[in-house]
Amino acid sequence: IVIGLDAEAAPIHVDNFVKLAERGEYNNVIFHRVIDNFMIQGGDFQNQDGTGGYAAEFYGYCDGNEQPNPCNYESQYTIPDEADNGLVHDSCTISMAKTNNPNTGGSQFFLIPEDSEPSHLDGVHTVFGEITSGCSHVTAISEVPTGAQGQDKPNSDVTLISVDIIRTAVEDTV
């Protein structure tokens, strides 16, 4: 799966994602939430179940609240929303997962398969890139059997082996 990141539209989200990827935080992380015709979610490098993960560094927010000084704990680092950047949740895009509260994105992200265009997320979650190759793999993952632990967790783990950053003259690609 190749993703072009849009640093112009979502500079903080792209910076955060790239730093986490370069630190290896996404290596061997599972897609813990998979919903057919909607999305696949991963990036919880802390707990692998959707309850963990945090931003790569202090971006001015701790647990969703703007702060002048860094948080007491790295696990409190969150990033400000950039959801009003003009990018929308079309099929084959990447967006930042967060809680129901603003400015609570950290490390978790979700990929939109070919058969989904969840426009109800526009202006709420930040789209920060587009899948330029391999979206059929995202769609295939979205169709795996789920229900493990009574949730949208795949019955068998689907693991993101590694995320590699390839710098180009135009944009970052993962």
Where are these regions (language model features)?
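Cyclophilin-like peptidyl-prolyl cis-trans isomerases
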Residues: I1-V174
